[in-house]
Amino acid sequence: MPPIPSRARVYAEVNPSRPREYWDYEAHMIEWGQIDDYQLVRKLGRGKYSEVFEGFKMSTDEKVVVKILKPVKKKKIKREIKILENLRGGTNIITLLDVVKDPISRTPALIFEHVNNSDFKQLYQTLSDYDIRYYLYELLKALDFCHSQGIMHRDVKPHNVMIDAEKRELRLIDWGLAEFYHPRQDYNVRVASRYFKGPELLVDYQCYDYSLDMWSLGCMLASMIFRKEPFFHGHDNYDQLVRIAKVLGTDELYEYIARYHIDLDPRFNDILGRHSRKRWERFIHAENQHLVTPEALDFLDKLLRYDHAERLTAQEAMGHEYFRPVVEAHARANGTEQADGQGASNSASSQSSDAKIDGA
């Protein structure tokens, strides 16, 4: 019996209601800029699909980041470019400035705005309770914006969240795994990085949606408030689900699987065992207690849910009590009345409705 499909609780109809050229990235015609206008300065890092350099635009002396793509299918390159173009100007989304092609290797390179990033492994150890709330609220602005534009990021993790600690600015980067959401569509489960993979990916449930990003955000929140990086530390994709089950419980996992008629890989029979759901309070210790509040645990509990349809949406998350101090500070800075704890989002109006499961 096939799994029961599900549908996003919000923004489900964004792409079906837009012209085909908005989401049909395979038909997208790339407009190539002039590579001679850019000079590389130093290598910043490398990923599975690219090498990243700091550079500058010679005509303006403007600092830029240059992402040189490794040979991958043209379809994947077009998808990343189309998504970045669609999201250009969105709150806290890295800005794509230009697309150029190396004349010798024929390799495409993406030119981005420069962000003076702080290394997250050092930065996260110094963040106060308020800082964590502040930066997660900024990240939620980016997530609600991309979701409102019909796009799932599918690789939310600290490495893809650039923070300029001096300017207190945040950018969500690396849209190479991002995809357009279409209701009832099956997607590849080989996305996201292991420690941030939602249970839906680990049980091979393909009909997922934007809520995948909210699980990853929950993993980031847990690692930040408990000072445990990463929070779920699996040795492989199978062990990753075991680590989650040891915290969220195995009974709850089996309920989720039954609800969606998911067939669990037989390999889990030997390794899952039986585990009770743990209270979040058990992860508090002397070094992290200043970061853990009742509202932080309530917020975390509403993100780290097996059932993707039960997780808070980005817009709901922004309205959570956890962000009240941030919203109040925003309101004071803007000289407006305090917005009773509701996070104002710059997205399209929420199409929120009850969680839907077809045929349930």
Curated annotation (Swiss-Prot):
Localisation per UniProt entry: Cell projection, Axon; Cell projection, Cilium; Cell projection, Dendrite; Perikaryon
Residues annotated for ATP binding in this entry: 44-52, 67
Tissue expression as described in the entry: Expressed in a subset of the adult male sensory neurons: CEM head neurons, ray RnB neurons, and hook HOB tail neurons.
Active site positions: 155
Keyword GTP-binding: no
Protein name as annotated: Casein kinase II subunit alpha
Reactions mediated catalytically: L-seryl-[protein] + ATP = O-phospho-L-seryl-[protein] + ADP + H(+); L-threonyl-[protein] + ATP = O-phospho-L-threonyl-[protein] + ADP + H(+)
GO biological process: DNA damage response; peptidyl-serine phosphorylation; regulation of cell cycle; response to hermaphrodite contact; vulval location; Wnt signaling pathway
Similarity field: Belongs to the protein kinase superfamily. Ser/Thr protein kinase family. CK2 subfamily.
Gene Ontology MF terms: ATP binding; protein kinase activity; protein serine kinase activity; protein serine/threonine kinase activity
General function of this protein: Casein kinases are operationally defined by their preferential utilization of acidic proteins such as caseins as substrates. The alpha chain contains the catalytic site. May participate in Wnt signaling. Modulates two aspects of male mating behavior; response to hermaphrodite contact and vulval location, acting in the same pathway as lov-1 and pkd-2.
Signal peptide (UniProt feature, chain positions): none
Residue segments, region Disordered: 334-360
Chain ranges of the Protein kinase domain: 38-323
Regions of compositional bias (Low complexity) in chain numbering: 338-354
Organism whose genome encodes this protein: Caenorhabditis elegans
The enzyme's E.C. designation: 2.7.11.1
PANTHER family: CASEIN KINASE II SUBUNIT ALPHA
SUPFAM superfamilies per record: Protein kinase-like (PK-like) (SSF56112)
PROSITE patterns referenced in this protein's UniProt entry, alphabetically: PROTEIN_KINASE_ATP, PROTEIN_KINASE_DOM, PROTEIN_KINASE_ST
Enzyme class: transferase
Description of how the protein assembles with itself and partners: Tetramer of two alpha and two beta chains.
